[in-house]
Amino acid sequence: MRKDIAMRYLLTGNEAIALAFYINGGQFASGYPGTPSTEILENLTKYSGNIHSEWAPNEKVAVESAIGASYAGVRSIAVMKHVGVNVAADPIFTVAYTGINAGLIIITADDPGIHSSQNEQDNRHYAKSAKIPMFEPANSQECFDFVNHAFKLSEQYQLPVFIRLTTRVCHSKSIVITSKHHRSIHLSIDKSSRFDPIPSISIKLHESLEHKLLDIANSNSYYCEELTNSQIGIITSGMSYNYVKEVFGNSVSILKLNLIFPLPINKVKQFCSKQKRIFIVEELDPFIEEAVKALGINCIGKDYIKCYSELNPYIIRKAFFPIIENEPSSNVPATTSKPFCPGCFYNTFFGVLSSYKNVIISSDIGCYSMSSKEPYNAKDIAICMGAGFSIAHGIQKSLDMLHSDKRVIGLMGDSTFFHSGITSLINCVYNNSNPILIILDNQSTSMTGMQDNPGTGYTLDHNPTTKIDLVKLLDSLNVKNIRTFNPFNKDQTIQALDYALLLDELVVLIAQGYCTLKLAKSTKKEASNNA
């Protein structure tokens, strides 16, 4: 890449974020794999000579590590999907008070339409609740540009800054014209008392934070205004802007918000004063709509446009022009294929597990989430990462009090166990619980693209590292009944489950297999290297 001139690339939003982080002097990146954000960190490995990028065990650790890098004077980024922000909320809320040293960006990749998640929470609310500025790009060029804006704003106000992506922005490709390189950004360590938020200091930090947000709101110039002779004005942001432009072209006035929190209050008032009617077009919750109404401005939003799933030009067109012919058909034929890949040990394991009837199965988030599908029907409940064991504990304790003979089986993968299952297991040990807990160890974070984790022995950039031994870890937690088995072997799987069901106490089974896709990928790469 030439460092002295601008270049043109065709990039996804995720690729643009990674490139911009490199060009703008970012040096530390941490995150946890999760669609649609995964490819950001994977692309940062291209710049391993300049950037330290890593998979963290979970999102909380990723944010805390990025805070540490910022404190040390290094520009940093923490990357996660929307539900990951729930895990990282504790440090996020406090670092807004203490502020940062070198620029700190937190990526939240939201999933309107629930393409690969368990919910479609709107993380714009985190910006308001945690009092952290938030950018929302609409395309890959803006993903690239907003990293630069975010770092400047972060360091100007000593605040972390959110960049909110959505699935379509993350994975859609568009032209990106890059700026010149400006790397080698490093600040000295800031040892001021604000980084020790005891109550007497925190109350002052909160007051300072409110003043910062007010100043940002009054000086916010991160918007695009398109004025026409129309008396209709639309306020929008992110991917919704693209849909608005496709439907209306230049026939209405548009105020596109790039920094969606805090709002550019003066510009919003000025724009609305020129229009006879104001409409708000946004995906999911009425976040912008409520903020505009709080300014005393009459506007129309979710009265016409749904507050669930993602938008598209057809939905917006129908909201404004109700009588439309040729409505797109939603009669998509259902798939009848098995939910797991050919050769995956989940086929054998869940085939066996589904034959056990007097059990309740508490599952988790991963490829095994699809065990509820035919022909297995081997899942009763799943909530979030790490909950498989915790919920199993709660159910089993309750059934025991009710003198039920049902046993509860908790399931999770190896990566999920390292993410947030360890504390759930400790809870079972500490509170003398007796569910059957099964770790499906396929040596991979497979559902998000076969990434490594603390149990694989390799880092994000494929360098060898210390491998966490699950059996030794469980033994150190004083788990008395530990058994490993080969889940590709039907007889071993049956024997392991029967063994666990005979014991009226806590049992942890480890299915020691491998991801067939990852194995095939590794074999192909090895053959290519040897060619």
Spans of model-derived segments:
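Short helix-loop-beta junction
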Residues: 43-49, 245-255, 472-480
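Short acidic, glycine/serine/threonine-rich loops at helix termini
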Residues: 40-43, 67, 88-92, 114-121, ...
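Thiamine diphosphate
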Residues: 1-140, 168, 227-228, 251, 372-510, 514-524, ...
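A glycine-rich helix N-cap at a beta->alpha junction
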Residues: 49-57, 98-109, 189-194, 430-443, ...
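Short beta-strand segments
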Residues: 79-80, 105-109, 162-166, 235-236, ...
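Flexible, low-complexity linker and terminal segments
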Residues: 2-18, 23-24, 137-340, 345-348, ...
